Amino acid sequence: MSSIGVVFRVTTFGESHGPAVGVVIDGVPAGIQLNEDYIRRELNRRRFCHIPVLNPRCEDEDFQILSGIKDGLTTGTPIAIVVWNKRAVSNYYMDIWMKPRPGHADLAWYLKFGKLYDFRGGGRASGRETVARIAAGAVAKAILKQTIDVDVSSHLIELGGVSISRDDYTFNDVAKSWEKPLPMIDDEAIEKAIKVLINAATEGDSVGGIGEVLTTEVPPGLGEPVFDKLKADLAKAVMSIPSTTGIEFGLGFKLARMRGSEANDQIVLRNGKPRLETNRVGGMLGGMSIGEPIRFRVAFKPTPSIRRPQRTVDLEKITETTITFTGRYDISTAPKAILAAEAMTAIILVDHAIRAGLIPRIIRK
C-alpha cells in the first residue's frame, strides 16, 4: 500500500501532476529539533536544476508543514508535510493515454486498475512521489543524529556507464560529494558523466546508474533474527523506489565468487569490543546490525520515457502501434533515486531503533 514502518510509520500520498505530494509521519518522538530550513535543504538536494537534462521540470519544492512541529521541536504527534506541484504540464500525456510506455509502470497499473488511475506524469509511479520520502527521510535523519548519533549519506558510483575511479573513500567524502554538480566523489567522472547525460538527451535517450548508501556506525541489535531482519526491511524499502532494479549489501554478488576464507570478516577486538576487521558483509550479520557501518549498493534502470519511437499496444483499439514521448523527462533517475534510498534507509533505521528501545518516546534535554 502507501505506508511503511511498524512504530515509526510513514505514509506518502499524491500524484505527479496532482496539486501536491505529501507525507504523514507517525511515531515521531517528542523533543526533536526540526525546522523548515533543514527540511528545505534536504528537498533542494534532489533538484539538480543546474543540469537541465536531469530535471527539466525543476520544481521549486515549496512545502508546508501542517502539523507535529511547534517552536522548532517535534510535539510527538504526526508530522504532515505537503510539497506543492507547481510546474506539471499534463498535455504531453494526453497523446499517449491508453498507450503504455515500454519500461514504465503504465501497463502494470492498467492491468490492475483499468482506467481508474491517474496516468499523468506516471501518477503514483512517478519519481515525483519520492519527494515525500525525502521529506520523511529528513525527519528520520534528524532523529537518528540527535538520539543515537548515526548519520546516513549516499553517492553515485556509476552514471551512464561512467564509474568513479576511487574505492578508498570515507563517509565524509561521500557526504561532501553532494556539494559537487553530481554526487560523485571523482571530479573527472563527474565531467565525463555530464557529457554522457547531454549526449543521451541529444539522442532522445536515457541512462541508468548505480548508487551507494552508507551510514556511520549503527548500534548492534537492530532487526530480528528471522522475518523482521533489518537487512530485509532495508531491501524492501529501497526496492520500492521507482526505477530500482537491484540491491547488494557489502561486497554483495562478489561474495558469491569467493571462498569462505576470503569472504569471512575476521572478528577482532577494538577498544575492548568485538568488531569486524573488514566489513565485507555491509554491517549486518543474521540480518541484524552489529555495531558496524551499514553499506549497500543500488542499481537504477534508465528512465523509460524517451524521445525515440518505441513499440507498444493501443489498449482501446487493441492494435500494435508506436509512440514517441515528447514531454519532459529526466535523462537519468539515478541522482534523485539514490537520495530516496538514503531517505528510506534513515526511515527504516529509526523504526528499528525505536522498536529496540534505543530511541525513547520523549527526548528531554
Swiss-Prot record:
<feature type="binding site">
    <location>
        <begin position="301"/>
        <end position="305"/>
    </location>
    <ligand>
        <name>FMN</name>
    </ligand>
</feature>
<keyword id="KW-0285">Flavoprotein</keyword>
<dbReference type="InterPro" id="IPR020541">
    <property type="entry name" value="Chorismate_synthase_CS"/>
</dbReference>
<keyword id="KW-0288">FMN</keyword>
<comment type="similarity">
    <text>Belongs to the chorismate synthase family.</text>
</comment>
<dbReference type="InterPro" id="IPR000453">
    <property type="entry name" value="Chorismate_synth"/>
</dbReference>
<dbReference type="Pfam" id="PF01264">
    <property type="entry name" value="Chorismate_synt"/>
</dbReference>
<feature type="binding site">
    <location>
        <begin position="124"/>
        <end position="126"/>
    </location>
    <ligand>
        <name>FMN</name>
    </ligand>
</feature>
<feature type="binding site">
    <location>
        <position position="286"/>
    </location>
    <ligand>
        <name>FMN</name>
    </ligand>
</feature>
<keyword id="KW-0456">Lyase</keyword>
<dbReference type="GO" id="GO:0010181">
    <property type="term" value="F:FMN binding"/>
</dbReference>
<dbReference type="GO" id="GO:0009073">
    <property type="term" value="P:aromatic amino acid family biosynthetic process"/>
</dbReference>
<dbReference type="GO" id="GO:0009423">
    <property type="term" value="P:chorismate biosynthetic process"/>
</dbReference>
<comment type="pathway">
    <text>Metabolic intermediate biosynthesis; chorismate biosynthesis; chorismate from D-erythrose 4-phosphate and phosphoenolpyruvate: step 7/7.</text>
</comment>
<dbReference type="GO" id="GO:0004107">
    <property type="term" value="F:chorismate synthase activity"/>
</dbReference>
<dbReference type="GO" id="GO:0008652">
    <property type="term" value="P:amino acid biosynthetic process"/>
</dbReference>
<feature type="binding site">
    <location>
        <position position="46"/>
    </location>
    <ligand>
        <name>NADP(+)</name>
    </ligand>
</feature>
<comment type="function">
    <text>This reaction introduces a second double bond into the aromatic ring system.</text>
</comment>
<keyword id="KW-0521">NADP</keyword>
<dbReference type="GO" id="GO:0005829">
    <property type="term" value="C:cytosol"/>
</dbReference>
<keyword id="KW-0057">Aromatic amino acid biosynthesis</keyword>
<feature type="binding site">
    <location>
        <position position="328"/>
    </location>
    <ligand>
        <name>FMN</name>
    </ligand>
</feature>
<keyword id="KW-0028">Amino-acid biosynthesis</keyword>
<keyword id="KW-0274">FAD</keyword>
<protein>
    <recommendedName>
        <fullName>Chorismate synthase</fullName>
        <ecNumber>4.2.3.5</ecNumber>
    </recommendedName>
</protein>
<dbReference type="InterPro" id="IPR035904">
    <property type="entry name" value="Chorismate_synth_AroC_sf"/>
</dbReference>
